[in-house]
Amino acid sequence: MLQYLVRHGESVSNLEGRVQGQEDIELSDFGRAQARQMADWSRRLSASPSAAPLTIGEVWSSPLRRARETAAEIAAALGLPVMVEEGLCELHAGIFQGHLWADLETAFPDEVAQWRSGDMHYVIPGGESRAQLAARGRATLEKLAGRDTSGMIVVAHGGVLTAALGSMLGREHPLLAAAAERPFTKLPALANCSVTQLEWPGPRLVSFNETGHLG
């Protein structure tokens, strides 16, 4: 079974340089255009002869608006419903949420220093740790991999997807070698509307952070 892991399109907070976490932020105009490009990508994917006998049978999304809006474009192109999975939510960034990244050091100097230390078990006040995020993301992808379908598209967030990938593959795969010494902190950032493929059982990383489908 193939999982196509998609980071949502650009959100308003991405554009503003603001910490989102689990705040329910909509897509920017550019993000909506990216989501439409993802709809075109999903049509090409389902029509490709090389995809046989793969069938995209399910589209899953985080409950957060920026992911649901992206998933809705994809699902509509495939004639499928969007199914929501709470475990795909982004990191709960606690007291950081809603603040501009540029203002964090001034507003929360001690907390930012601890977060940037790379301590996997440091819990942002009011939020969660990288270790908690990785465990949640990994368990969710493993659960979805057990579904009775040959292929699915999973729309989520950069933090939860990279944390889950680092947990599963960071010490084994060359594309994720940057995570070998400090998992969950040194993974390359996933681009908005990038596609990463996982093959199950395994998982085996087929591709990582692909953006060639975006204009």
Annotate the PLM regions:
Residues 7-80, 84:
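Active-site-proximal alpha-helix that buttresses catalytic centers in soluble enzyme cores
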Residues 3, 150-156:
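Generic beta-sheet signal
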Residues 73, 163-167:
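Active-site signature of alpha/beta-hydrolase-fold catalytic machinery across serine-
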Residues 76-138, 207-209:
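Phosphate-handling substructures
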Residues 11, 160-161:
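Short active-site segment of divalent metal-dependent hydrolases/proteases
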Residues 91-103, 166-215:
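Acidic, low-complexity terminal tails and accessory targeting/binding regions
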Residues 61-62, 135, 155-156:
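Short beta-strand scaffold positions
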Residues 41, 45, 77, 143, ...:
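Active-site catalytic microenvironments for nucleophilic, acid-base chemistry
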